[in-house]
Every structure is written in C-alpha cells, then in structure tokens.
C-alpha cells in the first residue's frame, strides 16, 4: 500500500490549501487520512474519512484554512490509518502566499 499526495493547491477564492491523496494497492472505505502541515515549530492538521474508488482509496478533500497558515513554505505529509493498513506519504513543500 502506497500513500501518495496527488494534489496541493492554494484556493485563494476559498481561502484554503487543498490536499488530495490516493492510497494505491487497497480498496476500502473504513480508513482515515490525516494531513499535517508544519512550519517553524507550528503544526496544523486536517482529517478526512477515506473514500472507496474501485481500484484505490482516496482522500480528496483535505483542507487547511489559510487563516491557520502563515506565509512561507510549509511541509505537508499525510498519514493513512484503517483497521487493516497504515501508511505515510512522502513530505512535500507547499508555498503559502
């Protein structure tokens, strides 16, 4: 099972950072994704219930309010946990304006 961040967009009109994730190699809907953004010792989290999608599992709606994220580069990683599986994505960098 692999956890992969597939989307990271600043949505200015909605004042949020949107993170999308896919878990390949599994197809289930009883897991949870937790995204953690960190910068200068501050951590902010966003959580979503996983969604079953034929040949994979997804979390496409992980969102952080930009009010909670100061301007600069944030490190973001996503953990997946279910009764059967656990996994962690690679960390990505996201620039917040």
List each model region and its residues:
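Short solvent-exposed strand-capping/beta-turn motif centered on an Asx-Ser/Thr pair
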Residues: 24-28, 83
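Short acidic/polar inter-strand loop motif in beta-rich domains
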Residues: 80-90
